[in-house]
């Protein structure tokens, strides 16, 4: 990593590259599921390492089972959950008191044991809130809970054919809220006007793949491409970059599954760091991982020219990678941990969390210089990662955790399937 560049400057550069179209997030804000720069990390704050009942600042029961990640904006916590058979968005204050609850249409419950009808996380641009649910409801909501507009993408474009539960979260640009659908059938990327909900463009995105290879659950990223704001989409075994004006594909990279493996959906969201997209693919959960380093830049089909490196010995199936201080960190589905140089793909170090029968579904977080990784059984591991790996805590929450942890100063928010927790300083 380049240690001579100050952390403050590095964070600004990453922010400018990735967060085009969003308002600048102050420390403690977490406007979407992987944070203000989509890295899954923060350089500010110092959330707790170990906690006991006295350090659980509050615990609030949610109205139904959910797997989305909360977001934070201006001392408010926003989280989706089903309520009385309907999709809902909740707002809480820092004490955990519910300020309002807004309901939409009927819930479409999850099929997977670790899925729900509200896997996608909310997003905010500082002017309003945007939500999407498995039922197809896409909505814009004011900070007082009033619905500005809503539409149903299942009613408009038909149901998805995903084997499991929709997980892609809304993506915000200066003008648009963007949604994607990657499945067997008509797959697409669509942009909707943030103010009115009117669809501005819809671009087909269809590729022939082996069985389930065209199923996608990852969330797109807004990046800077050749000097312009663009959208990077991972799914159907292709990485594509789209012009935000009309949705057309301006860059594409394939070659992710030349062996034709079946049952390889796209789940983990890539990270972008130092001009490289790091893409976790394959079936790490079945001992067949893939980790790709793809150089960005250029135009057209770059499959033959921009594939920088490939690892076949390490990866992650569900948890998304984290970018932090010039390195990419992986937490595999069974707890293997690695710190990787994105330029070469080589590991600085590898280690593992304690083995157990449960797997990792939540995407990890780096905050306070430490790695926070919830396991599906509710154990939240915390490890020091400076100059190697050192496990420092395992905190048992007592309920399953699928949503990713969210930092805010000296606090950490954890979304269990039934409760929302705040741990840290009071």
Question: Where are these predicted regions, by residue range?
Answer:
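Noncatalytic, solvent-exposed loop/strand surfaces
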Residues: 24-426
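N-terminal secretory signal peptides that target proteins for export/translocation
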Residues: 1-8
């Amino acid at each position: 990593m380049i240690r001579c560049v100050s952390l403050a400057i590095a964070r600004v550069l990453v922010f400018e590259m990735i967060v085009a179209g969003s308002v600048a997030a102050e420390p403690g804000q977490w406007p979407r599921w992987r944070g203000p720069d989509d890295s899954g990390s923060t350089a500010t704050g110092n959330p707790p390492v170990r906690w006991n009942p006295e350090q659980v600042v509050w615990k609030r029961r949610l109205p139904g089972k959910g797997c989305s990640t909360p977001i934070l904006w201006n001392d408010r916590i926003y989280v989706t959950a089903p309520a009385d058979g309907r999709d809902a968005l909740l707002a809480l204050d820092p004490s955990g008191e519910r300020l309002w609850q807004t309901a939409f249409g009927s819930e479409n419950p999850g099929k997977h044991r670790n899925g729900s009808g509200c896997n996608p996380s909310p997003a905010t641009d500082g002017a309003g809130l945007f939500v999407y649910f498995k039922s197809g409801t896409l909505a814009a909501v004011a900070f007082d809970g009033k619905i500005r507009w809503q539409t149903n993408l299942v009613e408009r474009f038909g149901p998805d054919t995903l084997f499991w539960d929709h997980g892609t979260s809304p993506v915000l640009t200066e003008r648009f809220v963007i949604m994607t659908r990657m499945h067997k059938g008509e797959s697409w990327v669509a942009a909707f006007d943030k103010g009115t909900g009117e669809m501005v463009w819809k671009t087909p995105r269809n590729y022939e793949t082996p069985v389930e290879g065209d199923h996608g659950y990852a969330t797109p990223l807004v990046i800077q491409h050749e000097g312009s704001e663009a959208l990077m989409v991972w799914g159907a075994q292709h990485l594509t970059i789209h012009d935000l004006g009309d949705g057309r594909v301006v860059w594409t990279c394939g070659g992710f599954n030349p062996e034709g493996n079946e049952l390889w959906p796209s789940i983990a969201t890539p990270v972008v760091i130092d001009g490289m997209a790091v893409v976790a693919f394959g079936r790490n959960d079945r001992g067949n991982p893939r980790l790709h380093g793809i150089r960005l830049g250029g135009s057209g089909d770059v499959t033959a020219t921009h594939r920088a490196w490939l690892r076949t010995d390490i990866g992650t199936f569900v948890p998304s990678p984290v970018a932090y201080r010039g390195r990419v960190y992986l937490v595999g589905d069974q707890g293997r941990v690695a710190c990787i140089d994105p330029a070469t793909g080589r590991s600085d170090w590898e280690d593992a969390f304690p083995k157990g029968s449960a797997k990792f579904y939540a995407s990890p977080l780096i905050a306070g210089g430490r790695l926070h990784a919830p396991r599906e059984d509710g154990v939240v591991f915390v490890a020091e990662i400076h100059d190697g790996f050192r496990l420092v805590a395992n905190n048992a929450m007592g309920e399953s955790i699928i949503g990713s942890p969210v930092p805010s100063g000296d606090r950490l928010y954890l979304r269990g399937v039934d409760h929302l927790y705040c741990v840290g300083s009071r």
